[in-house]
Design a protein with these regions (language model features):
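Interfacial segments at transmembrane-helix termini and the short loops linking adjacent helices
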Residues: 40, 105-124, 256, 318-349, ...
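Helix-terminus/linker motif at the lipid-water interface of multi-pass membrane proteins
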Residues: 24-42, 109-111, 172, 231-271, ...
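Signature of the first transmembrane helix
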Residues: 3-65, 94-102, 127, 158-162, ...
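Hydrophobic alpha-helical transmembrane segments
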Residues: 118, 122, 151-202, 218, ...
Length: 484
């Protein structure tokens, strides 16, 4: 069985643990945006708070997932000891930061413009602490090739999360608690992770190695900075809307209203992000495990080529079927932002390619380049949002995201060629992307009033595109899958 086939199989299983749970979580948008639950300005507060959470989570992990993969796969390494070292570092950082947030929750709440709601900060601090404590155990499941266990843990958690959201917001809803239910549901659902990894966590003992621990921190902190910059790129546009959107830009509506619309439509673009995440979970340990193979450059190039094809299918399928996907957003007032979804889908496609290209600085121990490239992305994000938001509102934020991720991808590719020669099929990849965009533009320019006819036509377009790609790629794909 070929290595790519193995990777594809693991990606499917990680999809069960990432795409399905996050897609189910995505369906919660329908509940949260219902007119009887949260108005756009309330949903905007949720969007803002989880944006801060994503940034802090990256700091808590401190790049230890990737550091664990790197040090545990070195020749002669003791995987169990490396695991304990990584877990010790993460827990030490997480307890310190989460404890500080809890101790000063009221002050933090005032700082982020939710004065009087310090309990939200406390909820989020505990949620982030539990996420961090189980992050390395989940990474270990990936390294030990246990994607089924990974999937079970994620699926049960999301099942609890959905059930609790439905119970709190439909059965036992109290308007005085409001958005607090969302954080409370996350907190209770996360407690399952502690039970799921109870044996691993109870067996863990803090350990420090005066040689390996500093080396892991030195390797991991550029990864953390890269991740922090990456999260900033992803989340900054949402926070920037709150700060830089001119008053009354959307007539009669607040910045929180615009942020709510933008955040809800962003969720549709997360369909691409889910596929990227599932692939990354399988691919990252795969790249490290196959780094010593002489044929690895050609292997990595083929993997990226097929990855781009799959992403193009997602881009096409979602972009020309927004008349169906819009119903996931609940109240019709959220639909006004649907036109930004294709822009964000394309942005996430570039982000996925960037993750593939970034293998060169991880395998050559030049992780500082990841920091340099992503900090450049942050600067691009800040400037683009500053220029575009006052002129185009949340559409400007969408274009800023695309400009950032595409620029990072280009920089990573150009610099990486100097250190690790990987024969990526850049021309073929770009051709597929351009063809997809042309089809999206053409199809969306055609107005079909009958919804059933429109949906059928769109499905035929997607199926036809997939068949054409299959006939173009069938020979090389069969050869690839047949290789040992």
């Amino acid at each position: 069985m070929s290595k790519i086939r193995n990777l594809a199989g693991e990606t499917v299983l990680y999809g069960l643990g990432t795409i399905i749970p996050r897609f189910i979580n995505f369906l919660l948008v329908r509940l949260h945006t219902d007119e009887s639950v949260f108005a756009p300005d309330e949903y905007g507060v949720i969007t803002k708070l989880f944006a801060y959470t994503a940034v802090i989570n990256t700091i808590l992990l401190f790049g230890m997932e990737t550091a664990y993969f790197r040090f545990a796969t070195k020749a002669g390494a003791d995987e169990k000891r490396v695991f304990r070292l990584a877990q010790t570092i993460v827990i030490a950082i997480s307890v310190a930061i989460s404890g500080g947030l809890i101790a000063f929750s009221d002050g933090v709440a005032s700082l982020i413009n939710i004065a009087g709601n310090g309990q939200y900060v406390t909820y989020l601090a505990i949620i982030m602490l539990t996420d961090a404590v189980v992050a390395i155990p989940f990474a270990r499941l990936r390294l030990l090739k246990k994607p089924l266990m990974f999937a079970i843990g994620k699926l049960v958690n999301i099942g609890l999360l959905v059930g609790l959201n439905v119970y709190f917001l439909v059965v036992a809803y109290n308007p005085e608690i409001g958005i607090g239910y969302v954080f409370l549901a996350n907190l209770i659902a996360n407690s399952f992770y502690l039970l799921f990894f109870a044996r691993t966590l109870l067996q863990w003992r803090p350990v420090f190695d005066r040689i390996v621990s500093p080396a892991m921190v030195q390797y991991g902190y550029p990864i953390m900075l890269t991740g922090l910059a990456g999260i900033t790129n992803e989340m900054f546009s949402r926070l920037a809307l709150d700060a830089w959107l001119p008053e009354n830009f959307y007539e009669g509506q607040s910045a929180d209203y615009a942020l709510g619309i933008f955040g809800a439509c962003y969720k549709l673009a997360m369909l691409m992000s889910l596929a990227v995440t599932a692939f990354r979970y399988a691919a990252e340990p795969f790249f490290f495990s196959n780094a010593a193979d002489k044929q690895s450059p050609e292997l990595f190039a083929r993997i990226n080529h097929y990855f781009v094809i799959v992403c193009c299918l997602i881009l096409l399928g979602v972009s020309i079927n927004l008349d169906i996907f819009k119903y996931f957003l609940g109240d019709a007032q959220y639909w006004e932002g649907l036109y930004i979804v294709p822009i964000l889908l394309l942005a996430y496609l570039f982000l996925g390619v960037y993750y593939n290209f970034s293998v060169w600085f991880k395998l050559t121990d030049r992780t500082y380049w990841g920091t340099i490239i992503t900090v450049a992305g942050v600067l691009i994000t800040v400037v683009a949002n500053y220029v575009l938001i006052p002129r185009y509102g949340y559409e400007g934020s969408s274009w800023a995201t695309l400009i950032c991720y595409s620029s990072m991808t280009v920089i990573c590719y150009l610099v990486g060629r100097r250190y690790l020669a990987i024969p990526y099929n850049i021309g073929g990849n770009l051709l597929y992307v351009m063809a997809t965009l042309l089809i999206v533009y053409t199809v969306n320019s055609v107005t079909i009033t009958n919804s059933w006819v429109a949906s059928t036509f769109h499905m035929v377009v997607v199926a036809s595109f997939a068949l054409i790609v299959f006939f173009i790629e069938r020979k090389s794909f069969r050869q690839t899958m047949a290789n040992k």
